[in-house]
């Protein structure tokens, strides 16, 4: 009987907001529009960072990687979410769920590490401007970006491998829009303390350590800016890092709220909190990638000029 209860699952049912079917059409339209904006905005940033020689700098190299990450991250979940809104049978295969978990976690981890690298880049640019070309040479910033991707892929491969080996005892209803790793782990009918410990270690290494690097970098940046006597100089120095700081606050604010809430929430109304988790996850998964190009371009003259001259590039010529 015990073996029978642990039958291998072939598919998962994505519950999402199926309890509110009238909202599904509204969510479909909103998420579809946001996804188009994500593709256009981040795609444009990638193009200009490649085609415009003036943007061949470490900062825009990292920004191009960040934009590519946002496109990959949203593409792992949004298309399937849109299909599920229009389909009566909201299912995903076990292998498809595993792939979605792997890609989503890999992209999320890579972005955490990459934001830390970008903070260090801004620290060197503002606090050590004369040594910036030496410290942030191509031999430095390319391995930094590659290391971010490597960390994300390895972390995701390890965690996903352990999760897919868990027994689910025919529990296949995921209370989420997509195969988010925590939502899948909740279905396991075995002790997941090992998985939770592994996730804790990964969170410290790939989320909190980059956050610590960001905090230290910006503490030194703010200290350096305050030493500048002219208000114009302070304003110019702060404008070079304000966009990145805004993105960091939105990204980390959302992710820390999601994954570091106290466990006492289980004693409260679980349905309301599940709905809250899903709404926050949607904000984290859609709003942040959509806002990143806007944040980086609104106060950036170089980006505005590059976008303005983009149609005249040889890339578009016959």
Curated annotation (Swiss-Prot):
Bilayer-spanning residue ranges: 26-46, 55-75, 100-120, 140-160, 198-217, 238-258, 278-298
Keywords: Cell membrane, Disulfide bond, G-protein coupled receptor, Glycoprotein, Membrane, Olfaction, Receptor, Sensory transduction, Transducer, Transmembrane, Transmembrane helix
UniProt-listed GO biological process terms: detection of chemical stimulus involved in sensory perception of smell
Matches recorded under Pfam families: 7tm_4
Glycosylation sites (chain numbering): 5
Any one GO molecular-function label of the UniProt entry: olfactory receptor activity
Cytoplasmic-side positions: 47-54, 121-139, 218-237, 299-318
Family: Belongs to the G-protein coupled receptor 1 family.
Record-given protein name: Olfactory receptor 13C9
Protein species of origin: Homo sapiens
Classification lineage: Eukaryota, Metazoa, Chordata, Craniata, Vertebrata
């Amino acid at each position: 009987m015990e073996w029978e209860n642990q039958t291998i699952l072939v598919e998962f049912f994505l519950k999402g907001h199926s309890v509110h079917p009238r909202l599904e059409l509204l969510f479909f339209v909103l998420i579809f529009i946001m996804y188009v904006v994500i593709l256009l905005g981040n795609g444009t940033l990638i193009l200009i960072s490649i085609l415009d020689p003036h943007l061949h700098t470490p900062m825009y190299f990292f920004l191009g990687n960040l934009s590519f990450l946002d496109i990959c991250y949203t593409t792992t979940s949004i298309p399937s979410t849109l299909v599920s809104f229009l389909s009566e049978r909201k299912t995903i295969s076990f292998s498809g769920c595993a792939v979605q978990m792997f890609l989503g976690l890999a992209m999320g981890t890579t972005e955490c590490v990459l934001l830390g690298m970008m903070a260090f880049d801004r620290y060197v640019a503002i606090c050590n401007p004369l040594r910036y070309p030496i410290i942030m040479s191509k031999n430095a910033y390319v391995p930094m970006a590659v290391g971010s991707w490597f960390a994300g892929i390895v972390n995701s491969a390890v965690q996903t491998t352990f999760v897919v080996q868990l027994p689910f005892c025919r529990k296949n209803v995921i209370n989420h829009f997509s195969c988010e790793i925590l939502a899948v782990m909740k279905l396991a009918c075995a002790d997941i303390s090992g998985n939770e410990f592994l996730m804790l270690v990964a969170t410290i290494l790939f989320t909190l350590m980059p956050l610590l690097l960001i905090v230290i970098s910006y503490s030194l940046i703010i200290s350096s800016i305050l030493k500048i006597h002219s208000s114009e100089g302070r304003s110019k120095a702060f404008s070079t890092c304000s966009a990145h700081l805004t993105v960091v606050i939105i990204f980390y604010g959302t992710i820390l709220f999601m994954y570091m809430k106290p466990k006492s929430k289980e004693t409260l109304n679980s349905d309301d909190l599940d709905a809250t988790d899903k709404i926050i996850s949607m904000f984290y998964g859609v709003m942040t990638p959509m806002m990143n190009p806007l944040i980086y371009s609104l106060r950036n003259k170089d980006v505005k000029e590059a976008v303005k001259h983009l149609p005249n590039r040889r890339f578009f010529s016959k």
